[in-house]
């Protein structure tokens, strides 16, 4: 299996068509291109996602034969499939988020199907990681109070959604909301439409491992906002980037809200990954129409920021899905979907 990039036609017209003329917050033309290296062709079996680096381990979701998570030792190539699918003790249904807390050395898994947040010890051995005996805490939410997504932050948790027109909810250690904050960018006229407004302006979140900072970014708008925890309560915004609003439609039906993309809908941020020093963000910045054009190069941009929100540098990579960064090794690991197969790929930073 080879990894290839679909190159733009080498003409002035085709090259200019690789990006539209809309205003953007960063100079993507000046980003450094990274070359891919195939790590594993056969290990990824489903649609792997949510990767996280823990020392020499790559942890990610990839449902296979009733197991939800794969733990791969990057040094030896050995791996384990862990966590059975179900609602019993030590089982999960649908993992929305994998978070690491460096303060207490724990891994938290948020299951938005079972409405449950489970905390595991991260200090266990390779053979005992994610075992039932390694569970340290479980928080169950009622159906009416379960957030769309949540992650440990400060002394509790942070959740995103539409909370009376606010972007985020600050939760205590038991998962109870202590207040809402954050203003959605751009046009807020329909903020009162609840879930429909949130799905239009849906955000990704990433939290610094020591829980002192977090960032959020838009799927269909290019808001990227940084916050730091405050002992007084409401987190303080330290930096925000924003140049264009979401251009999508929403449809409400009996099962919830559906987002409908248009040809001019821009796919903005795709994945955020936090390390001790930096936030890494992958960004497409192309419309649906552009992504369907075979003459336009299929690449993603990786943006690197410090936790105050200062832009450090940028890279150009292939058409990757989710990714994780091993800062010690200076390497970015990504999932690439090509010709019906998922490939674990690495880029040296």
Predicted region positions:
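Blade-loop segments of beta-propeller domains
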Residues: 78-108, 112, 135-139, 317-322
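Loop/turn-rich, solvent-exposed surfaces of beta-rich toroidal or solenoidal domains
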Residues: 262-304
